[in-house]
Amino acid sequence: MLDPATPSGETSPCLEPREEILSLWRAFDPLSFESRSRALRLGEIIPVVSGGPYRPDGEIAVVLDGCLLLDDGKRGTHCGVAAAGDLIDIAGGSPGLWLSNGLVYRAPVAAFCREAGEEGVQFLLAGGLKRLKSMEARLRCAMSHGAVSRVASFLLDIHRATGGFEIALSQSNIGALLSLRRSSINQACQSLRAAGALRTVRGRILLKDEAVLASLACCHYRPRSPAFAEAIAAEAA
């Protein structure tokens, strides 16, 4: 268990002022200081590995670091990209695949609500509503935008969640996740290559120009996090 309220590191390694503790504190920012201090003592921080599966277990789960690709658990259809600060499980969520190493905070739902009180319940309801609206937006996108825009938005989501320019997915992987026919995903990637947005290698996508990718994407994609600004600038240099 951890105690983000006292990050001095005097009694436990978990109390050190590490970036994951700060990420955890920021993720629950809507709660008052007292509610956060009580509720966050209940949970634990769990490391995850790139390429590993994510399976919801009915507890509260929040991404602290890393990028998680969510799917519907049946056909493998894309349901969203989760990154630091995103609530991914509230007594049942979507399974997925980790696209990078990372960290997840988990805590029992009942105990969290008991400690955080009404604030905690409202926080979880707001998180669930955000997930629902995100999935609705993706459904509208799939119905109203072409393959090029959908693929560009998908890649931009992952890039802005990770700050990286290499995505460990093949064209066929992306086509399956977005429910695109083989001819459609091939044509979309060819168009993005011709525009200078990306380069494809075996089993990977290498992003070359974020601005070009954004110009071709539809309106629903993750805003760039200020925390990634320096990393993105350094990687692009």
Predicted regions span which residues?
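Cyclic-nucleotide recognition modules
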Residues: 75-133, 137
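Cyclic nucleotide-binding regulatory module and flanking cytosolic helices
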Residues: 1-49, 86-88
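Polybasic "coupling" helices that flank or enter modular domains
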Residues: 118-182
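Phosphate-/nucleic-acid-contacting segments
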Residues: 158-237
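Glycine- and acidic-residue-biased ligand/ion/polar-headgroup-sensing regions
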Residues: 56-74, 84-85
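Structural motif
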Residues: 59, 67, 101-103, 204
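His/acidic/aromatic-lined binding-pocket segments of jelly-roll/cupin-type domains
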Residues: 45-46, 53-64, 79-80, 96
